[in-house]
Amino acid sequence: MKVLQEINLTYSILVIADFSSIFGCLLVLIAFKKLKLLRNHITRVIACFCVSSLLKDIISTGLTLSLGPQNEAGSTSFQCYLYAITITYGSLACWLWTLCLAFSIYNLIVKREPEPEKYEKFYHGVCWTIPLICVIVMLAKKTIEPVGNWCWISEKYVGYRFGLFYGPFFAIWIISAVLVGLTSRYTYSVIRNSVSDNKDKHMTYQFKLINYIIVFLLCWVFAIVNRILNGLGYYPTLPNILHTYFSVSHGFFASVTFIYNNPLMWRYWGSKIFLIFAKFGYFVELQRRLDRNKNNNNPSPILNSYAATVYHSSTIESLSLQHNNDISNDNQQQQQQQQTPQQPQQQFQQQQSPTVIEMQNLKQDQNIENNEQNENCYNTIDTNIEINTNKLNDNSFEITQPSNDLNTIENNNNYNNNNNNNNNNSLVIEKEKDEREKKDNKF
């Protein structure tokens, strides 16, 4: 009787997890379809994950309902083979798309890849081919049998379970964790050295970088623990229930994470949900505000974009520091000039020839003009950053190319240095001429 109750409980949890995963993936895919602002490289990777999870969950749900709690499928039936193929192929594909997501984010932020779309064909080749190889090996070795509420690799083939399924899981998760760790380390270094005061929001952004990989681990860690216990001959109830629910509902929790990371998406669905209450007079203002801002590219200190955030944070930081250093240097020069006695300067200017004085005045005019050009470049950079910020989507994950104004400032500085060197050489030549003329006059 206790075993029958456990089977029925596990079956109910399995059905709930299947439907919740289907629901979550549909929410993400519908939002991507409706919101054109979300269509970019990263969202295409997420969409492929959701498609893989959705197809897996639809097929497995149909098989679960048709076989019933007792799993009446025979070990050689078509339904049993289809169930095992669906679980193995669909789960591996979802894991690999998660790895591709981690690599894409790392590639955009740390490596600043200008054309991440060129990797999409490689992603498709890996994510659809590797699961197929594992399925072919599983079928060739005839390892499939009814296992609890579904069909999968028999308990007699523990080596195949870990070699074809949980072994790739460990490899995929470790590589994804390393990529996310490198990305988080890079962004943290930018945030720590940033001049921005919104560090709390920056830490929220930092959490958004790693939450999907945490969900990935939590959803499958119970499955690994349960299978290790099964391999040792133990079949506890609680690990089996946790394994059933979290592994099957991975698509749901991943979809919730994607929606949480993207304000455009939760505004869109929030406006749809509160529209029902607004018809009865509840949450009217909230629904209007969400509907009004669902397509709004709200600029924020973190820009709500993985790649654009890091680029603009580092750019603003470097420009601010450079600009502050220039201002401090100018202030120091002005203070030194004010502290210097004026009478010796006037006497020195009277002793100098008119040509030398004109050259000094020309040098000062050129320095003023060059400073104005640099100031205009800084203003242009600030304007371009503001324009690019307004064009970004919330969590659109698009990267913006660096502005050419940085090169302009560098060229202006090089030009200033060359002019200063030429002016100094001219002053030395003029001084030598004056000294020679004075010596000639003495003789």
From Swiss-Prot:
Keyword Oxidoreductase present in the record's keywords: the answer is no
Extracellular compartment segments = 1-11, 66-89, 141-161, 230-263
Q: How does it sit in the membrane?
A: Multi-pass membrane protein
Q: Where is this region: Disordered?
A: 325-354, 396-443
| Lineage, uppermost ranks | Eukaryota, Amoebozoa, Evosea, Eumycetozoa, Dictyostelia
Which terms are listed as keywords in the entry?
G-protein coupled receptor, Glycoprotein, Membrane, Phosphoprotein, Receptor, Transducer, Transmembrane, Transmembrane helix
Location relative to the cell: Membrane
Species source reads Dictyostelium discoideum
Q: Where is the composition biased (Basic and acidic residues)?
A: 429-443
What is this protein called in UniProt? Cyclic AMP receptor 4
Q: Does the keyword Transmembrane apply?
A: yes
Q: Write out the PTM section of this UniProt entry.
A: C-terminal Ser or Thr residues may be phosphorylated.
Q: Which GO terms describe its cellular component?
A: plasma membrane
**Predominant place of localization:** membrane
Q: What GO molecular function terms would the record report?
A: cAMP binding; cAMP receptor activity; G protein-coupled receptor activity; protein tyrosine phosphatase activator activity
- Biased region (Low complexity) positions are 332-352, 411-425
The entry's family comment says: Belongs to the G-protein coupled receptor 5 family.
> Where does the source fall among the domains of life?
Eukaryota
Q: Which residues are tagged as glycosylated in the record?
A: 8
Q: Which InterPro entries did the record assign?
A: GCR1-cAMP_receptor (IPR022343), GPCR_2-like_7TM (IPR017981), GPCR_cAMP (IPR000848)
Parts of the chain that traverse the membrane: 12-32, 45-65, 90-110, 120-140, 162-182, 209-229, 264-284
UniProt topological domain (Cytoplasmic) ranges: 33-44, 111-119, 183-208, 285-443
What are the BP-aspect GO terms?
A: adenylate cyclase-activating G protein-coupled receptor signaling pathway; cell differentiation; culmination involved in sorocarp development; negative regulation of gene expression; positive regulation of gene expression; signal transduction
Q: Which PROSITE patterns match?
A: G_PROTEIN_RECEP_F2_4 (PS50261)
